[in-house]
């Protein structure tokens, strides 16, 4: 298992709805990150799905946070953008960046109001192409950004002194973030 400082609690979080095409980018990215890499004990990998304010407790426990999400930056579809710390909107009056009904900035704001927001925030967002395809897969330009987004997360973790290691064997089904029937390979890549 990789090593890192145990007093530096890190949360790697993917948020989104896998049932709405590109809205599922964050969940699919964190799922693939978990499939590819082993992390030290002070790093938690979480599929936050569409849990909204239920995620506040997880943020309160973290010193540092990396979030994968589909973000409407107004860029060309499939474009990645990384924002850090104060660039990540914390207050509900900020322009909504998240595509979820409860914006993630409300979650950050709630943790901040409780005085327990992570000290360092990194948001890795991908500009969606299609949010209207109920039950549809990620579109190609968004799907193609999963690997580069994971590379960005690994770079951030390295900046924070965290060593991750590539898994040598596939995860057992019981260790996956998502049940086998809704993971990326079995759900989105199934024959039409």
UniProtKB/Swiss-Prot annotation:
GO molecular function, one term: endopeptidase activity
Residues in coiled coil: none
InterPro entries per the UniProt record, alphabetical: Pept_A31_hyd_express (IPR004419), Pept_HybD-like_dom_sf (IPR023430), Peptidase_A31 (IPR000671)
GO biological process, one term: protein processing
Residues holding Ni(2+): 23, 69, 100
Keywords from the named record: Aspartyl protease, Hydrolase, Metal-binding, Nickel, Protease
Name of the gene: hupD
Protein name per the record: Hydrogenase expression/formation protein HupD
């Amino acid at each position: 298992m990789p090593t890192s400082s145990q007093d530096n609690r890190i949360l790697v979080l993917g948020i989104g709805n896998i049932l709405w095409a590109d809205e599922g980018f964050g969940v699919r990215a964190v799922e693939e990150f978990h499939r590819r890499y082993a992390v030290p004990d002070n790093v938690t990998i979480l599929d936050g799905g569409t849990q909204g304010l239920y995620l506040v407790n997880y943020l309160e426990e973290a010193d540092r946070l990396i979030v994968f999400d589909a973000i409407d930056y107004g860029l060309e579809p499939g474009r990645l953008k990384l924002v850090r710390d104060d660039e990540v909107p914390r207050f509900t009056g900020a322009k909504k960046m998240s595509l979820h009904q409860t914006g993630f900035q409300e979650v950050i704001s709630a943790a901040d109001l409780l005085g327990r927001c992570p000290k360092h925030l990194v948001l890795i967002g991908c500009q969606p192409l299609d949010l209207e395809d109920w039950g549809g897969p990620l579109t190609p330009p968004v799907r193609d950004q999963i690997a580069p987004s994971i590379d960005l997360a690994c770079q951030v973790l390295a900046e924070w002194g965290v060593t991750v290691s590539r898994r040598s064997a596939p995860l057992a089904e019981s260790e996956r973030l998502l049940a086998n029937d809704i993971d990326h390979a079995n759900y989105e890549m199934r024959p039409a």
